[in-house]
Amino acid sequence: MAVRDGGGSAPVGSQEQAVDRVRETVARSRRYGAVAPETVRRLAERALVASRGDEPEAVKRTKRSLHEIYGAYLPERAPGYPGLLRDIGAAVGGGDPDAVAAAVSRAMRVHASTRERLPYLREFYAAVFGAVPTPAVVQDLACGLNPLAFGSMGLPAQTTYLASDIDSQQMEFLDRALDLLEVEHRVEVVDLVSGAVPAQHADVTLVLKTLPLLERQRAGAGWELVDALRSPFVVVSFPTRSLGQRSKGMFQTYSAAFEAQAAERGWTFDQAEIANELIYIVRR
């Protein structure tokens, strides 16, 4: 028998079943099948409320939300991860550093965020890691394909790299690619908005172009994440142009928001702007 709350709302059991149906429908789609179930379920719950229980509409809303936070950064066709792994493996086996760098760059072009950063990759990481003590452990949250840039970060070979995101196929690819590149690492699938903040200590945590996406899903989620991190240094960045290369006053909006939050928490920080990215290196 379904359990009802005291306010005459729909039966709890039927609500949960509706969420499951929406989640399962979205998960069967080719584009979003690899997304963490927690992410899809959370967005499905919100979509069902917004659509007043209309399940087909909730499926559309869930896919739209996934596009905004995930799908827009990837190509329309599924990334060719097996071929990219073969290219990286062949380049590593050939022993030519230039060939390895070229194969890694081709892989990084699959994701919009890393593709945008490629022209100034070394400059970007010189600014980041030149401002902090040399880390033994780096954590990269909502990482996309950013861990592939390890060779451009100027870090010691023995550095441990912890990477997480919501795409299980992407994380499997990174795990195998970082093995080939001989980077000490651990990868996991994590939905940051659900409160699954990694508990491990890291000397530096990267949260690159991520806070606006978390805040879009739930107000306060991004700042709660940063507060919960076990890192003395946190690198937060914001895009200053959209994927369509429009500025929309993004620098002013994000800089004002960040600096207000930093003042409230008593953080000290360095600021840099490189190409279309506003960077804050926070000491806590």
UniProtKB/Swiss-Prot annotation:
Gene3D superfamilies named among the record's database cross-references: DNA helicase RuvA subunit, C-terminal domain (1.10.8.10), Vaccinia Virus protein VP39 (3.40.50.150)
Protein residues bound to S-adenosyl-L-methionine: 73, 111-113, 117, 142, 165, 191-192, 208, 217
GO annotation, biological process: response to antibiotic
Transmembrane segments: none
Record flagged with keyword Cytoplasm: no
InterPro entries the UniProt entry points to: rRNA_MeTrfase, rRNA_MeTrfase_GmN_bac, SAM-dependent_MTases_sf
UniProt feature coiled coil, ranges: none
Pfam families reported in the protein's UniProt record: FmrO
Keywords: Antibiotic resistance, Methyltransferase, rRNA processing, S-adenosyl-L-methionine, Transferase
Additional facts recorded: Protects Frankia sp., which is an antibiotic-producing bacterium, against self-intoxication.
Family statement drawn from the similarity comment of this UniProt entry: Belongs to the methyltransferase superfamily. Aminoglycoside resistance family.
Function text: Specifically methylates the N(7) position of guanine 1405 in 16S rRNA. Confers resistance to various aminoglycosides, including gentamicin and kanamycin.
Protein's UniProt name: 16S rRNA (guanine(1405)-N(7))-methyltransferase
Protein species of origin: Frankia casuarinae (strain DSM 45818 / CECT 9043 / HFP020203 / CcI3)
Upper classification of the organism: Bacteria, Bacillati, Actinomycetota, Actinomycetes, Frankiales
Gene that encodes the chain: Krm
